[in-house]
Every structure is written in structure tokens, then in C-alpha cells.
Swiss-Prot record:
Disulfide bonds: none
PANTHER family the UniProt entry points to: FERRITIN, FERRITIN LIGHT CHAIN
Keyword Metal-binding: yes
GO biological process: intracellular iron ion homeostasis; iron ion transport
Major localization class: cytoplasm
Protein name from the UniProt record: Ferritin light chain
Span of domain Ferritin-like diiron: 1-59
Cleavable signal peptide: none
GO molecular function, one term: ferric iron binding
Length: 78
């Protein structure tokens, strides 16, 4: 959860920087941020959120088994 929170904070900082670039009419900065950072951040945040949701679903009486299956079936494919 902490890692997801950090990624969301980083994404917000990049969005703020993009807004500043737009306000200052700097298309090169905006293009650079869009192509190299913003799209990837959104994908990463989505993936982390999905993994976190799956881990929450797997927690329960047999949390150890759920975590094992999560690692085996999900993280090995990334």
C-alpha cells in the first residue's frame, strides 16, 4: 500500500509539472513527460492497484496459501 501511495504521489508531481509546462507554453516538456513518464506511471499504478486488490481478496484464514499462489501465478509472469 505504501508503494502505491508513493507512485500516486510521483504521478501527481509529474501531472503538476506537465501543467506548468502547459502554462509556460513548453510543448517539448509536455511531450517528453507524456511519452516517457505519464503513460507508464498510469500503467504501473493500475497494475499495482490490481495486485493489491488481489492480495486483499486472498487474505483470510489461509493467507499463507493465498500469498504463495499470488506470487506463483502473478509475479512470476511480470
Amino acid at each position: 500500500e505504501a508503494a502505491l501511495h508513493l507512485e500516486k504521489g510521483l504521478n501527481q508531481a509529474l501531472v503538476d509539472l506537465h501543467a506548468l509546462g502547459s502554462a509556460r507554453a513548453d510543448p517539448h516538456l509536455c511531450d517528453f513527460l507524456e511519452n516517457h513518464f505519464l503513460d507508464e506511471e498510469v500503467k504501473l499504478i493500475k497494475k499495482m492497484g490490481d495486485h493489491l486488490t488481489n492480495l486483499r481478496r486472498l487474505s483470510g484464514p489461509q493467507a499463507g496459501l493465498g500469498e504463495y499462489l499470488f506470487e506463483r501465478l502473478t509475479l512470476k509472469h511480470d
